[in-house]
Amino acid sequence: MKAYIGIDNGVSGSLALVVEDIAEFRKMPTFKEQSYTKAKAQITRVSWMDLDILLAAWCSRPYDHIRAFIERPYMNPKGFKATVSALRCLEATLISVERAERLSYEYIDSKQWQKVMLPKGCKGPDLKTASRDIGCRLFPGCSVAIKIHKDADSLLIAEWARR
């Protein structure tokens, strides 16, 4: 039996496990702390320790093969702060993924899975709406969590990989 993990990277992202007709959906584990800058500000970080625990639990199950598909973060040279945040999140996620036993992984671009899983012509805010609606339709057991999170990107990534 093969298992697929979809990772919608970032502090507002999520993780999903899809195995045949079983699906699990979790929001990315995060925590807030004082910013590393001198400014009086809070930053949100990925909790690699909690992510370690979740991935270890998923990888300890008796699957023949388990692979993670990590969405490559969007980089915008004009948006320095957002780019730094995306890279910090990616690094924390990679630490946990690389520590998980038996877990192979690869990077994917959002367009790869969106082209297959979402309707043609979706752009901007419509992408999240379509993700939520399609995720609820394909994975009704996860619909409450999807609606709270407002999208099902990680589930759709994992389902795209499974197909």
Predicted features along the sequence, with ranges:
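Phosphate- and other anionic-substrate recognition elements at nucleic-acid/protein interfaces
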Residues: 1-163
